[in-house]
UniProtKB/Swiss-Prot annotation:
This is Glutathione S-transferase U8. Gene3D superfamilies: 1.20.1050.10, Glutaredoxin. It comes from Arabidopsis thaliana (Mouse-ear cress). Keywords: Cytoplasm, Detoxification, Phosphoprotein, Transferase. It is found in: Cytoplasm, Cytosol.
Amino acid sequence: MNQEEHVKLLGLWGSPFSKRVEMVLKLKGIPYEYIEEDVYGNRSPMLLKYNPIHKKVPVLIHNGRSIAESLVIVEYIEDTWKTTHTILPQDPYERAMARFWAKYVDEKVMLAVKKACWGPESEREKEVKEAYEGLKCLEKELGDKLFFGGETIGFVDIAADFIGYWLGIFQEASGVTIMTAEEFPKLQRWSEDFVGNNFIKEVLPPKEKLVAVLKAMFGSVTSN
């Protein structure tokens, strides 16, 4: 890879947001340099330089220019490297729908899951119900498709990486049950197919390490 195509990714090993970017880079076969950031301690001068507003990961650096926010980065990669593994449909309506569901995952489902697992106990029942209802909408949207993107992994699948891998880890670490195979058979099957993809599997963080870190940071409901 020549210098003008040099790609760097500033990320965090256990972050589903960072992993979204890595997944797309792997799926498209784009070589990149990965740089681990300590976002909970001393943020590096590079992170402060390339994302001075939010000071968060992930940050993609391409040709010396930086892009922040995981789904923005994913779209940038799609627009820049169009020849391999297309993740957004060409039809404008279908692209808009993909963006809608990706935003739904972030703003509805993921937020509710986090609150259900580690939010105030007084609000847990409400948040579990909200997360459950959000997952039911995704179950319906997935239907009988192999992936949200159809026959191959697409934009919504990448956005939903949290559901495919991290949700089970959150449930194990917190002791809160939201999604079961019996109630969400389509999402369960999708999760297995998604994390079973060789390119996806390659970048997933160790489950045991994530569970231990989450328990240390937040504790579990069953231990309270």
